[in-house]
């Protein structure tokens, strides 16, 4: 059984995300899902012995410890060896934790669908290019560090905004949009693809 630890950044969408994962099975078995607030310690997260980690959406900026708590430490200390999916703030935190820059989006977006162009790999494997994705954010990755590939973008008034990143060496994938939103056409596919990668990583 796959043990999934969700780091909750105090977001109303966290349990929608948990529900999406709870609907999935890996090799016929349901997931063992543990949710912990970002006020947990790194040792608490480590002691849960996760096979996979999800970093939830949340308010605030990844540079502020009060906003992200243990999130950045999880990304740099545990996600180097444990498959991790970051969502919204999870992407921003990953980019920031590995030396990138987070800035303001051209305009705050809360609950609008935009087409996502992606590379067809990782969490995007087999998904339609240009599928609609629900955006709920005012921050974006403005400078992505070299250790990440940009895996997805969306066009916002002629400007390409980062919608997905994938670490080149570690099993970290992140999306800026919300796969658990009803506005996202392939959200279940993103979740399934992540779990497929987790299962393969677990066997390796």
UniProtKB/Swiss-Prot annotation:
<dbReference type="GO" id="GO:0004049">
    <property type="term" value="F:anthranilate synthase activity"/>
</dbReference>
<feature type="active site" description="For GATase activity">
    <location>
        <position position="180"/>
    </location>
</feature>
<dbReference type="InterPro" id="IPR006221">
    <property type="entry name" value="TrpG/PapA_dom"/>
</dbReference>
<feature type="binding site">
    <location>
        <begin position="138"/>
        <end position="139"/>
    </location>
    <ligand>
        <name>L-glutamine</name>
    </ligand>
</feature>
<keyword id="KW-0456">Lyase</keyword>
<keyword id="KW-0315">Glutamine amidotransferase</keyword>
<dbReference type="InterPro" id="IPR050472">
    <property type="entry name" value="Anth_synth/Amidotransfase"/>
</dbReference>
<dbReference type="InterPro" id="IPR017926">
    <property type="entry name" value="GATASE"/>
</dbReference>
<dbReference type="Pfam" id="PF00117">
    <property type="entry name" value="GATase"/>
</dbReference>
<keyword id="KW-0028">Amino-acid biosynthesis</keyword>
<comment type="pathway">
    <text>Amino-acid biosynthesis; L-tryptophan biosynthesis; L-tryptophan from chorismate: step 1/5.</text>
</comment>
<comment type="subunit">
    <text>Heterotetramer consisting of two non-identical subunits: a beta subunit (TrpG) and a large alpha subunit (TrpE).</text>
</comment>
<protein>
    <recommendedName>
        <fullName>Anthranilate synthase component 2</fullName>
        <ecNumber>4.1.3.27</ecNumber>
    </recommendedName>
</protein>
<feature type="active site" description="For GATase activity">
    <location>
        <position position="178"/>
    </location>
</feature>
<comment type="function">
    <text>Part of a heterotetrameric complex that catalyzes the two-step biosynthesis of anthranilate, an intermediate in the biosynthesis of L-tryptophan. In the first step, the glutamine-binding beta subunit (TrpG) of anthranilate synthase (AS) provides the glutamine amidotransferase activity which generates ammonia as a substrate that, along with chorismate, is used in the second step, catalyzed by the large alpha subunit of AS (TrpE) to produce anthranilate. In the absence of TrpG, TrpE can synthesize anthranilate directly from chorismate and high concentrations of ammonia.</text>
</comment>
<feature type="binding site">
    <location>
        <begin position="58"/>
        <end position="60"/>
    </location>
    <ligand>
        <name>L-glutamine</name>
    </ligand>
</feature>
<dbReference type="InterPro" id="IPR053448">
    <property type="entry name" value="AS_beta_subunit"/>
</dbReference>
<keyword id="KW-0057">Aromatic amino acid biosynthesis</keyword>
<dbReference type="GO" id="GO:0005829">
    <property type="term" value="C:cytosol"/>
</dbReference>
<keyword id="KW-0822">Tryptophan biosynthesis</keyword>
<feature type="domain" description="Glutamine amidotransferase type-1">
    <location>
        <begin position="3"/>
        <end position="204"/>
    </location>
</feature>
<dbReference type="InterPro" id="IPR029062">
    <property type="entry name" value="Class_I_gatase-like"/>
</dbReference>
<dbReference type="GO" id="GO:0000162">
    <property type="term" value="P:L-tryptophan biosynthetic process"/>
</dbReference>
<feature type="active site" description="Nucleophile; for GATase activity">
    <location>
        <position position="88"/>
    </location>
</feature>
């Amino acid at each position: 059984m796959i043990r999934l630890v969700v780091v909750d950044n105090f977001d109303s969408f966290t349990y929608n995300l948990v529900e999406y994962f709870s609907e999935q099975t890996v090799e016929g078995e349901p997931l063992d899902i543990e949710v912990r607030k970002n006020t947990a310690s790194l040792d608490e997260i480590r002691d849960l012995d996760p096979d996979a980690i999800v970093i939830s959406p949340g308010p605030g900026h990844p540079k502020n410890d009060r906003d992200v708590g243990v999130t950045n430490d999880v990304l740099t200390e545990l996600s180097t060896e444990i498959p991790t999916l970051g969502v919204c703030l999870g992407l921003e935190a990953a980019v920031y934790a590995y030396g990138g820059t987070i800035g303001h989006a051209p305009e705050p977006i809360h609950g609008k669908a935009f087409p996502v162009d992606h590379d067809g790999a990782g969490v995007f494997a087999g998904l339609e290019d240009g599928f609609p994705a629900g955006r709920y954010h005012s921050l974006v990755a403005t400078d992505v560090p070299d250790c990440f590939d940009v895996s997805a973008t969306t066009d916002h008034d002629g400007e390409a905004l980062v919608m997905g990143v994938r670490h080149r060496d570690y099993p970290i994938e992140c999306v800026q949009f919300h796969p658990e939103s009803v506005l996202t056409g392939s959200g279940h596919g993103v979740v399934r693809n992540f779990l497929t990668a987790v299962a393969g990583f677990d066997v390796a």
